[in-house]
Amino acid sequence: MSEVVVANNANINPSAAAAVGATSVALTLGGSSTYDETSDFEGGYLVVNDATGEGRVYSINYNSTVSAGTALTVYLDDAIETALTTSSEVTLVKNPWADVVIAAAGHVHFAAGVPLVTVGSAASVPQFFWAQTWGVCGVWDDAATAIGAVLQSGTTAGQVEVGDGAAQPVGVQLYTGVDGEYYPKFLTIAP
């Protein structure tokens, strides 16, 4: 799962206007946001959610280093198409496949995929692995599950259960599932 969304990354006013053709946007983050690497938002998105430029989405190439409450500059893959003002509001979205965590109860994350290897939950060093996001995959059932059921992350880390409509669907059950066993699902996270 993607890491928990940081509230301070939403509804941010640019600290300076960004003209058409600009490839960077200066922002001032509030609260406890701390980004100590220039890759924190690499592959993520800057979404203009209100005022001038709203509706535009820009892919982030990289960002400057910053501590809480200070300026952050995001460098974009493409140029600004509609000028941003200091009244524009933007939201920063990290790459959904960066800094993933093992699914836990509460369904507060974006499901990033199903790893086909065991991934440690308390590793102090980053672990790299491939996660399947689409197609037939053996996934651990949290309960008996009927064929055709739409699935979401389960209440036990690493398991899936029948969706309740409140969480992101992750796939469809292909065979009647048994609690605690790995049965085939068709994942629908990202093609």
Regions found by a protein language model. Name each.
Residues 43-50, 90:
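Short conserved beta-strand and strand-loop elements enriched in small hydrophobics
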Residues 1-28, 32, 37-38, 54-191:
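Extracellular receptor-binding modules and their adjoining Ser/Thr/Gly/Asp/Asn-rich linkers
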